[in-house]
Amino acid sequence: MAEEQIKKSLFLLLQHMEREEFKGYDPYDGLLSPLFKLPLLSAHHTLRFYAQQAVKRSRINLRPILGIKKGLNPVTLGLAVQSYTTLYSAVKKEEYRQKAEQLITQLEQFSAKGFHGTCWGYDFPWEARYATIPAYQPTVVATGIIANGLYEAAVQLSSQKAREMVVSAAEFVLHDLNRKTDTDQSFCFSYSPFDHEMVFNASMKGARLLSQAYALTGKEEFITTATNAIRWVMKNQDEQGVWIYSKRESGKWVDNYHTGYILDCLSAYIQLSGDTSFAPALNKGLNYYANNFISADGQPKFYNNERYPADCTAAGQTLLT
Protein backbone atom coordinates (compact mmCIF):
# COMPACT_ATOMS: atom_id res chain seq x y z
CA MET A 1 0.00 0.00 0.00
CA ALA A 2 2.76 2.44 0.94
CA GLU A 3 4.69 1.59 -2.24
CA GLU A 4 1.63 2.24 -4.40
CA GLN A 5 1.02 5.56 -2.66
CA ILE A 6 4.62 6.61 -3.28
CA LYS A 7 4.36 5.67 -6.97
CA LYS A 8 1.10 7.58 -7.31
CA SER A 9 2.58 10.67 -5.65
CA LEU A 10 5.72 10.44 -7.78
CA PHE A 11 3.94 10.34 -11.12
CA LEU A 12 1.38 12.98 -10.16
CA LEU A 13 4.26 15.30 -9.28
CA LEU A 14 6.14 14.42 -12.46
CA GLN A 15 3.08 15.13 -14.60
CA HIS A 16 2.59 18.46 -12.84
CA MET A 17 6.21 19.50 -13.39
CA GLU A 18 6.13 18.58 -17.07
CA ARG A 19 2.80 20.34 -17.57
CA GLU A 20 4.28 23.50 -16.02
CA GLU A 21 7.50 23.06 -18.07
CA PHE A 22 9.38 22.95 -14.75
CA LYS A 23 8.39 26.51 -13.90
CA GLY A 24 7.07 27.49 -10.50
CA TYR A 25 7.26 29.78 -7.51
CA ASP A 26 10.06 29.80 -4.97
CA PRO A 27 9.76 30.80 -1.30
CA TYR A 28 12.31 33.57 -1.89
CA ASP A 29 11.11 34.93 -5.25
CA GLY A 30 9.21 37.93 -3.84
CA LEU A 31 11.63 40.45 -5.33
CA LEU A 32 10.58 39.46 -8.85
CA SER A 33 7.58 41.76 -8.37
CA PRO A 34 7.75 44.77 -10.74
CA LEU A 35 7.29 46.93 -7.62
CA PHE A 36 10.91 46.28 -6.68
CA LYS A 37 12.15 47.92 -9.86
CA LEU A 38 10.89 51.27 -8.56
CA PRO A 39 13.74 53.60 -7.46
CA LEU A 40 12.80 53.64 -3.77
CA LEU A 41 12.49 49.87 -3.53
CA SER A 42 15.27 48.73 -5.85
CA ALA A 43 18.09 49.67 -3.46
CA HIS A 44 16.54 49.58 0.04
CA HIS A 45 18.08 46.41 1.50
CA THR A 46 16.10 46.25 4.75
CA LEU A 47 12.76 46.94 3.10
CA ARG A 48 13.46 44.37 0.39
CA PHE A 49 14.53 41.77 2.96
CA TYR A 50 11.35 42.06 4.99
CA ALA A 51 9.14 42.24 1.91
CA GLN A 52 10.72 39.02 0.69
CA GLN A 53 10.04 37.43 4.07
CA ALA A 54 6.42 38.62 3.98
CA VAL A 55 5.84 36.97 0.60
CA LYS A 56 7.52 33.80 1.83
CA ARG A 57 5.57 33.57 5.10
CA SER A 58 2.14 34.76 3.97
CA ARG A 59 -0.67 32.24 4.46
CA ILE A 60 -2.06 33.28 1.07
CA ASN A 61 -0.11 33.34 -2.17
CA LEU A 62 0.63 37.03 -2.78
CA ARG A 63 2.54 36.46 -6.00
CA PRO A 64 -0.31 36.88 -8.51
CA ILE A 65 -1.31 40.11 -6.74
CA LEU A 66 2.30 41.38 -6.89
CA GLY A 67 2.77 40.44 -10.54
CA ILE A 68 5.28 37.68 -9.85
CA LYS A 69 5.36 35.08 -12.61
CA LYS A 70 6.41 31.47 -12.25
CA GLY A 71 10.13 31.14 -12.95
CA LEU A 72 12.42 28.50 -14.38
CA ASN A 73 15.03 27.76 -11.73
CA PRO A 74 18.20 25.94 -12.88
CA VAL A 75 18.14 24.03 -9.58
CA THR A 76 14.77 22.56 -10.54
CA LEU A 77 16.27 21.35 -13.82
CA GLY A 78 19.18 19.76 -11.95
CA LEU A 79 16.83 17.93 -9.61
CA ALA A 80 14.74 16.81 -12.60
CA VAL A 81 17.88 15.40 -14.25
CA GLN A 82 18.51 13.41 -11.08
CA SER A 83 14.89 12.22 -11.01
CA TYR A 84 14.77 11.12 -14.65
CA THR A 85 18.13 9.38 -14.25
CA THR A 86 16.87 7.47 -11.22
CA LEU A 87 13.67 6.51 -13.04
CA TYR A 88 15.62 5.31 -16.06
CA SER A 89 17.89 3.19 -13.86
CA ALA A 90 14.84 1.67 -12.17
CA VAL A 91 12.69 0.82 -15.20
CA LYS A 92 15.03 1.28 -18.24
CA LYS A 93 12.43 3.35 -20.10
CA GLU A 94 14.23 5.24 -22.89
CA GLU A 95 11.88 8.21 -22.54
CA TYR A 96 13.45 9.06 -19.17
CA ARG A 97 16.98 8.97 -20.57
CA GLN A 98 16.00 11.31 -23.39
CA LYS A 99 14.32 13.76 -21.02
CA ALA A 100 17.37 13.81 -18.77
CA GLU A 101 19.64 14.53 -21.75
CA GLN A 102 17.37 17.36 -22.92
CA LEU A 103 17.56 19.03 -19.51
CA ILE A 104 21.33 18.58 -19.37
CA THR A 105 21.59 20.56 -22.61
CA GLN A 106 19.26 23.20 -21.19
CA LEU A 107 21.39 23.52 -18.05
CA GLU A 108 24.41 24.39 -20.18
CA GLN A 109 22.60 27.51 -21.33
CA PHE A 110 21.95 28.67 -17.76
CA SER A 111 25.58 28.47 -16.64
CA ALA A 112 26.98 31.79 -15.40
CA LYS A 113 29.82 33.28 -17.44
CA GLY A 114 33.17 34.67 -16.34
CA PHE A 115 34.22 31.96 -13.88
CA HIS A 116 36.73 29.11 -13.95
CA GLY A 117 34.05 26.49 -14.50
CA THR A 118 30.40 25.72 -14.97
CA CYS A 119 28.25 27.22 -12.21
CA TRP A 120 24.70 28.30 -11.52
CA GLY A 121 22.57 30.63 -9.44
CA TYR A 122 18.85 31.09 -8.87
CA ASP A 123 16.55 32.73 -11.41
CA PHE A 124 15.52 35.49 -9.00
CA PRO A 125 17.29 38.17 -6.95
CA TRP A 126 17.18 37.70 -3.19
CA GLU A 127 18.21 39.47 -0.05
CA ALA A 128 20.37 37.69 2.50
CA ARG A 129 21.05 39.38 5.82
CA TYR A 130 24.60 40.07 4.69
CA ALA A 131 24.17 40.96 0.99
CA THR A 132 21.99 41.43 -2.07
CA ILE A 133 22.32 38.51 -4.49
CA PRO A 134 21.35 39.23 -8.11
CA ALA A 135 19.49 36.70 -10.24
CA TYR A 136 21.75 33.99 -11.68
CA GLN A 137 24.75 34.99 -9.53
CA PRO A 138 26.38 31.60 -8.90
CA THR A 139 26.45 29.96 -5.48
CA VAL A 140 27.97 26.70 -4.30
CA VAL A 141 24.51 25.58 -3.15
CA ALA A 142 22.84 25.89 -6.55
CA THR A 143 25.93 24.55 -8.30
CA GLY A 144 26.29 21.64 -5.88
CA ILE A 145 22.66 20.53 -6.19
CA ILE A 146 22.74 20.70 -9.98
CA ALA A 147 26.11 18.97 -10.24
CA ASN A 148 24.79 16.15 -8.05
CA GLY A 149 22.10 15.43 -10.63
CA LEU A 150 24.66 15.68 -13.42
CA TYR A 151 26.97 13.27 -11.61
CA GLU A 152 24.21 10.67 -11.44
CA ALA A 153 23.60 11.14 -15.17
CA ALA A 154 27.32 10.82 -15.90
CA VAL A 155 27.51 7.53 -13.99
CA GLN A 156 24.13 5.93 -14.67
CA LEU A 157 23.48 7.23 -18.20
CA SER A 158 27.14 7.44 -19.29
CA SER A 159 26.44 11.03 -20.34
CA GLN A 160 29.68 12.59 -21.53
CA LYS A 161 28.20 16.07 -21.45
CA ALA A 162 27.12 15.63 -17.83
CA ARG A 163 30.59 14.32 -16.94
CA GLU A 164 32.28 17.35 -18.49
CA MET A 165 29.97 19.73 -16.64
CA VAL A 166 30.65 18.11 -13.26
CA VAL A 167 34.41 18.32 -13.75
CA SER A 168 34.10 21.92 -14.94
CA ALA A 169 31.96 22.81 -11.91
CA ALA A 170 34.70 21.40 -9.66
CA GLU A 171 37.06 24.01 -11.12
CA PHE A 172 34.56 26.69 -10.08
CA VAL A 173 34.64 25.33 -6.52
CA LEU A 174 38.44 25.15 -6.49
CA HIS A 175 39.21 28.55 -7.95
CA ASP A 176 36.24 30.91 -7.51
CA LEU A 177 34.98 30.32 -3.98
CA ASN A 178 36.62 32.02 -1.02
CA ARG A 179 37.95 30.04 1.94
CA LYS A 180 38.20 30.57 5.70
CA THR A 181 41.20 28.43 6.68
CA ASP A 182 42.12 27.26 10.19
CA THR A 183 45.65 26.59 11.44
CA ASP A 184 45.26 22.85 10.77
CA GLN A 185 44.53 23.68 7.09
CA SER A 186 40.89 22.66 7.33
CA PHE A 187 38.65 25.31 5.81
CA CYS A 188 35.14 26.41 4.91
CA PHE A 189 34.08 27.29 1.35
CA SER A 190 32.19 30.56 0.99
CA TYR A 191 28.56 30.57 -0.15
CA SER A 192 29.49 32.37 -3.37
CA PRO A 193 32.54 34.05 -4.94
CA PHE A 194 31.28 37.38 -3.59
CA ASP A 195 31.14 36.70 0.16
CA HIS A 196 32.96 35.04 3.04
CA GLU A 197 29.94 33.39 4.71
CA MET A 198 30.56 30.18 6.66
CA VAL A 199 27.49 28.01 6.03
CA PHE A 200 27.99 24.35 6.86
CA ASN A 201 25.72 22.70 4.31
CA ALA A 202 27.00 25.01 1.56
CA SER A 203 30.63 24.09 2.16
CA MET A 204 29.67 20.41 2.23
CA LYS A 205 28.08 20.73 -1.21
CA GLY A 206 31.38 22.02 -2.51
CA ALA A 207 33.20 19.08 -0.91
CA ARG A 208 30.76 16.56 -2.39
CA LEU A 209 31.15 18.07 -5.84
CA LEU A 210 34.94 17.77 -5.60
CA SER A 211 34.55 14.15 -4.47
CA GLN A 212 32.36 13.42 -7.47
CA ALA A 213 34.83 15.06 -9.84
CA TYR A 214 37.58 12.95 -8.24
CA ALA A 215 35.55 9.79 -8.84
CA LEU A 216 35.23 10.74 -12.52
CA THR A 217 38.84 11.83 -13.09
CA GLY A 218 41.12 10.52 -10.33
CA LYS A 219 42.56 14.02 -9.90
CA GLU A 220 44.13 14.09 -6.42
CA GLU A 221 43.67 17.84 -5.92
CA PHE A 222 39.92 17.34 -5.95
CA ILE A 223 39.86 14.81 -3.13
CA THR A 224 42.55 16.37 -0.92
CA THR A 225 40.70 19.69 -1.07
CA ALA A 226 37.40 17.96 -0.33
CA THR A 227 38.94 16.23 2.70
CA ASN A 228 40.14 19.50 4.23
CA ALA A 229 36.70 21.06 3.72
CA ILE A 230 35.03 18.03 5.32
CA ARG A 231 37.37 18.21 8.32
CA TRP A 232 36.31 21.80 9.04
CA VAL A 233 32.60 20.95 9.08
CA MET A 234 33.14 17.84 11.20
CA LYS A 235 35.01 19.92 13.81
CA ASN A 236 31.84 21.95 14.19
CA GLN A 237 29.53 19.01 14.92
CA ASP A 238 28.46 19.06 18.57
CA GLU A 239 28.37 16.08 20.94
CA GLN A 240 24.76 15.26 20.03
CA GLY A 241 25.59 15.09 16.33
CA VAL A 242 24.18 18.52 15.47
CA TRP A 243 25.27 21.25 13.10
CA ILE A 244 23.76 24.72 13.31
CA TYR A 245 23.06 26.50 10.02
CA SER A 246 26.06 28.85 9.97
CA LYS A 247 28.73 30.61 12.01
CA ARG A 248 26.76 33.87 12.00
CA GLU A 249 25.03 34.90 15.21
CA SER A 250 21.76 34.88 13.23
CA GLY A 251 22.41 31.32 11.99
CA LYS A 252 22.17 29.32 15.20
CA TRP A 253 19.06 27.32 14.35
CA VAL A 254 18.96 23.58 13.50
CA ASP A 255 16.60 22.46 10.74
CA ASN A 256 15.67 19.36 8.79
CA TYR A 257 16.89 19.75 5.25
CA HIS A 258 20.12 21.66 5.87
CA THR A 259 21.10 18.90 8.30
CA GLY A 260 20.06 16.33 5.70
CA TYR A 261 22.21 18.03 3.07
CA ILE A 262 25.27 17.73 5.31
CA LEU A 263 24.63 14.05 5.97
CA ASP A 264 24.01 13.25 2.30
CA CYS A 265 27.20 15.05 1.26
CA LEU A 266 29.24 13.32 3.96
CA SER A 267 27.89 9.93 2.94
CA ALA A 268 28.79 10.62 -0.71
CA TYR A 269 32.31 11.71 0.27
CA ILE A 270 32.90 8.53 2.29
CA GLN A 271 31.67 6.32 -0.55
CA LEU A 272 33.63 8.10 -3.28
CA SER A 273 36.88 8.63 -1.38
CA GLY A 274 37.02 5.40 0.63
CA ASP A 275 37.89 7.53 3.68
CA THR A 276 35.97 6.02 6.61
CA SER A 277 37.48 8.25 9.30
CA PHE A 278 34.32 10.38 9.33
CA ALA A 279 31.92 7.42 9.60
CA PRO A 280 31.38 7.97 13.36
CA ALA A 281 30.33 11.58 12.69
CA LEU A 282 27.94 10.36 9.99
CA ASN A 283 26.39 7.75 12.29
CA LYS A 284 26.02 10.25 15.12
CA GLY A 285 24.39 12.76 12.77
CA LEU A 286 22.02 10.19 11.29
CA ASN A 287 20.96 9.05 14.74
CA TYR A 288 20.21 12.63 15.75
CA TYR A 289 18.33 13.22 12.49
CA ALA A 290 16.13 10.14 12.88
CA ASN A 291 15.29 10.98 16.50
CA ASN A 292 14.66 14.70 16.09
CA PHE A 293 13.36 15.43 12.58
CA ILE A 294 10.68 12.77 12.18
CA SER A 295 7.63 12.86 14.44
CA ALA A 296 6.07 9.76 15.98
CA ASP A 297 3.40 9.68 13.25
CA GLY A 298 6.04 9.81 10.50
CA GLN A 299 5.69 13.47 9.53
CA PRO A 300 8.95 15.31 8.79
CA LYS A 301 9.57 18.17 11.20
CA PHE A 302 10.97 21.49 9.97
CA TYR A 303 13.13 22.26 13.01
CA ASN A 304 14.62 19.93 15.59
CA ASN A 305 12.20 21.37 18.16
CA GLU A 306 9.23 22.37 15.97
CA ARG A 307 7.11 20.41 13.49
CA TYR A 308 5.84 23.36 11.48
CA PRO A 309 5.88 24.84 8.91
CA ALA A 310 5.01 21.77 6.82
CA ASP A 311 7.55 22.03 4.03
CA CYS A 312 8.01 20.12 0.77
CA THR A 313 11.82 20.40 0.87
CA ALA A 314 11.92 18.95 4.39
CA ALA A 315 9.61 16.12 3.29
CA GLY A 316 11.66 15.34 0.19
CA GLN A 317 14.98 15.53 2.03
CA THR A 318 13.71 13.23 4.78
CA LEU A 319 13.06 10.53 2.18
CA LEU A 320 16.57 10.92 0.78
CA THR A 321 18.40 11.07 4.11
Task: Give the predicted meaning of each segment.
Residues 1-321:
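Glycan-recognition and catalytic cores of secretory/periplasmic carbohydrate-active enzymes
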